[in-house]
């Protein structure tokens, strides 16, 4: 079409040129329209030039192709207090509505919903009107306060959300109270199911821990029985030693010698016993008290037996601690105060 318009203008100028003839027309054409000048070369060169010109026009047309689409393809309306964004998806060219929660949802949630709805979307992002990219963590309520650009693949949508009046301080405080009440209501309604799931999880954990502990517990009971037996023998041996010492001193005092001779002997025996108790304190850093001495002797025999039997005492202690912690958590979970029961129900359960 541009070539036809050029030829018409050329014929008009030539007809007005008069005496210039073909030469004048050719000069005028070459000077004013170099792209449409009449060539004096051979016909086949002119034919080649005519085939090369449309390629340059096509390249120019592709370079200035616009990717901005009208804003009507993306609309934002409020339904029941929630923003509903309608977007024309690129794959099937059909509109799809996305209902968002202004408080809990973010820009990242909206972008993920777009990609999940249309698998043909390779790149999607949101930019501010001045070209700054909006972070995925930005809330929907903040995004809808101003205009923004939605970029889907190579298409850019200018979105103009409807303006809404900002809440006053009193309305915002009332809204926060309503949110708190809704959260408490949700917790009250769902706490029973949560309690059951948590209790089932703790019971399963207890069963698993007890199964792991069962073989170790059998070995521990056997080692403990042997250590208890040896400790009892030591205690009875101490009593037998004291009885034997008493009999020997009585024999020497009343039958063999007199008290005047045995009195210094008993003094040194008593002082030697005091030295032995002090040596026990120096070695063990514990006072020589019979129950503590007995427990210490029991532990010595137990650790010797565990080492001899290759009993994994560290693993046993870890399992016992885990079981105790799980039982404590289960008891705390079943506590009426933790499930927000009224005081009257607590009194009835007691």
Curated annotation (Swiss-Prot):
This is Calcium uniporter protein, mitochondrial. Keywords: Acetylation, Calcium, Calcium channel, Calcium transport, Coiled coil, Glutathionylation, Ion channel, Ion transport, Membrane, Metal-binding, Mitochondrion, Mitochondrion inner membrane, Phosphoprotein, Transit peptide, Transmembrane, Transmembrane helix, Transport. Ca(2+) binds at residue 263. The keyword Membrane applies. Its main location: mitochondrion. Residues 50-232, 283-350 are mitochondrial matrix. The selectivity filter, in which calcium ions are arranged in single file, is composed of two acidic rings separated by one helical turn along the central axis of the channel pore. It is found in: Mitochondrion inner membrane. The keyword DNA-binding does not apply. Channel-forming and calcium-conducting subunit of the mitochondrial inner membrane calcium uniporter complex (uniplex), which mediates calcium uptake into the mitochondrial matrix. MCU channel activity is regulated by the calcium-sensor subunits of the uniplex MICU1 and MICU2 (or MICU3). Mitochondrial calcium homeostasis plays key roles in cellular physiology and regulates ATP production, cytoplasmic calcium signals and activation of cell death pathways. Involved in buffering the amplitude of systolic calcium rises in cardiomyocytes. Phosphorylation by CaMK2 in heart leads to increased MCU current. The regulation of MCU by CaMK2 is however subject to discussion: another group was unable to reproduce these results. Phosphorylated on tyrosines by PTK2B/PYK2, promoting oligomerization. Glutathionylation at Cys-96 in response to reactive oxygen species (ROS) promotes MCU higher-order assembly, leading to constitutive activation of the MCU channel and mitochondrial calcium overload. The gene is Mcu. Residues 1-49 form a transit peptide. Residues 191-220, 310-338 form a coiled coil. Changing residue 256 to V: Strongly reduces calcium channel activity. MCU channel activity is regulated by the heterodimer composed of MICU1 and either MICU2 or MICU3, which act as calcium-sensors. At low calcium levels, MICU1 occludes the pore of the MCU channel, preventing mitochondrial calcium uptake. At higher calcium levels, calcium-binding to MICU1 and MICU2 (or MICU3) induces a conformational change that weakens MCU-MICU1 interactions and moves the MICU1-MICU2 heterodimer away from the pore, allowing calcium permeation through the channel. MCU channel activity is gated by EMRE/SMDT1 via the juxtamembrane helix loop. It is a multi-pass membrane protein. It comes from Mus musculus. A motif (Selectivity filter) lies at residues 259-267. One of its GO terms (biological process) is positive regulation of mitochondrial calcium ion concentration.
